[in-house]
Amino acid sequence: MQIAVYKPKHKVRIVTAAALFDGHDASINIMRRIIQSTGVEVIHLGHDRSVEEVVNTAIQEDVNAICLTSYQGGHNEYFKYMYDLLKERGASHIKIFGGGGGVILPSEIKELMDYGIARIYSPDDGRELGLQGMINDLVKQSDFAIGDTLNGEVKTLQNKNAKDIARVISSAENFPEVAKEALEIIHKKNKNSKTPVLGITGTGGAGKSSLVDELVRRFLTDFPKKTIGIISVDPSKRKTGGALLGDRIRMNAINNSRVYMRSLATRQSNLALSKYVHEAIQVLKAAQYDLIILETSGIGQSDTEIIEHSDVSLYVMTPEFGAATQLEKIDMLDFADLVAINKFDKRGSLDALRDVKKQYMRNNNLWDIHQDDLPVYGTIASQFNDPGMNTLYKAVMDKLVEKASADLKSTFTISNEMSEKIFVIPPSRTRYLSEISENNRAYDKSANLQVEVAQKLYGIYKTIESVLNVTASELKQSFLDTYGLNSDEILKHVQDDNKNFIKLLIAEFDRVKLNLDPYNWEVITNWGETVNKYKNPIYSFKVRDQEIKIETHSESLSHLQIPKVALPKYQAWGDILKWCLQENVPGEFPFTSGLYPFKRTGEDPARMFAGEGGPERTNRRFHYVSAGLPAKRLSTAFDSVTLYGNDPDLRPDIYGKIGNAGVSICCLDDAKKLYSGFNLADVMTSVSLTINGPAPMLLGFFMNAAIDQQCEIYIKENGLEKEVEAKMAKIFKDQERPKYNGGLPQGNNGLGLMLLGVTGDQVLPVDVYLDIKTKTIAQVRGTVQADILKEDQAQNTCIFSTEFALRLMGDVQEYFINNNVRNFYSVSISGYHI
């Protein structure tokens, strides 16, 4: 049965987000879509949002409710802290809703709702109510008036109290009659206001929000004491009345006490601005912000509404506007003070820049101005410190001073560089993966053709065998030893009436064999030798100039000899060649079964997985799970605080997640404690680091922990303990010395704990330390996950831009190559997360 959609009686606004250090955004994305379709204006923040950021947003946006998902633990502290912070800031009317699947226990749900959380939805609620039913309940509880009364907020606007500013805007938007008197007072106050308004408009998807964020970041740096207000407008849905106010998800610089942002829905069709924009601007002027930015929703070619509300207007577009004649239809090119061609990394950007400049020149009759001096700029807002954005920012500030007499004289320094995408993968190599797949398909096609040739040769061979008076082994020897057919030798065994026939077959064999690659003929001729290698009791091969001998068979409980590598019993050359070209034995091309002929013996592939609490607790767990086993295969899970590259803290929304579902590691000493008692340079020890975003940093901790372990061994072997202790006592003269908390677990000999708080280069001669370092990093075994593409697509712990993160991956691998790090892998592809 279809559940009826609840229709709210008031204009309901809700903030949606996923909790701090939580990348599970699939659920909240589904929920906010249903909330929006229920007629609600949704301010969506995305994933990994702190309590302070959510609360600041809720107050600035004057919302009815906050809706959160939390799947990463720490929910008790997170929700309670949010409730307390809202209460502390006088916003306890904002209701809090949450969910986390089975992560939040029924007892915890009761505890949180008793504390004051409006509702935590459980899987049982989902089964009972359905998705729409849950959203109906949420919206119904949030359906109350905002701004129906004012209590003197207008008198304190100049204090820039976000709650007061937001309430006056809400009153003007929701109850114009209630706000009428307050707005009259504001208009009188603003008669002499010199606060400039920068209007930013453009087509949908042009990157306006990212561009605004970059302008704000530069403004805050350029003017350390000035403030900025932002009004961002998004369209309302005509069908439902709901709206997605999603500009904040692109804003990284606005969580600052000097920035106020308010998102507005148009609440009308076919217009890019809300009819209450003027009132919102007046409120921000009364609050005495130094600059106001007004960003519209996406506009069409004929929309110029922005110029009525702004002192300076900026039109944002992309290079993909179609034919140059389309520019003649864009009204904003007649009125805009500045034009930004964003996403300037797109193909054809330079041509677009030229065409837009020409059109701008024609529209404004600027025939005497050189094209380079026209206010048209190429920008890449998504790229950090983009030169085009720097130039645009300076031009905007200069225009505000010129047109609005604003006290915003910029000291921002710019270069004459043009925006140019800094590519991790050069454009000429963007088809790299396609080329690999094309090459693989071409290889498969070639292999199949070669298989057909080999099979035809085998058919000719069997035909000759059937008419000769020789055994198959004699004929085969004749074929293979002579690398072809020895006609004279074979014809000795042929009756006179068959000689011409055999000559024809031999000639055909030689002709067909011309189409067979010599390498493939060698594969066929060596097949018998390959089979014998795996029949012999011992298989010998070399790895890095070291000869390794492996038993080819293992003995079963029934005392049967079971081959470790079983070869197919093919006879036909086509079958043999196809198997060798597409599968083959381990250690041979195409390496489908690994790089080496056999796996290392004496090291069972047991995964000793651990990660909980602090480093000492997980260290004890590692020693417990590896006790009595010759090989130590330590696999490390990190908590969400570490996964997002943050330090642990007493702040409740962080504190609740420390050591939850993984170990908390934030410094080198933590890594030393975590792996203490395990010789990380031992050939029987390997470590897996399940970390991605901050992988290079955690890898650095691990490598330095391993190096300092070997420094400790060197110190003890050379009797340098007293000398080193004296140096460390001097270093820690006026501070507490770090230590391993609690007693050492069984099996932990304390290796790695001597140099807590220092590194080997502080207590050993430089040449000794560098020698130990070089040897250690070449010996350590293991892997770090560092699969950034998977994070970008699924897990959401890519804490840097994807391009920068990929560059880091490349830099790490380059270091490994240059320093002979061959036993530790710099990346482990784990696409199963996707």
Enumerate the language-model features and the residues they cover.
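Cofactor-cradling patches in redox/metallo enzymes
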Residues: F21, I28-G133
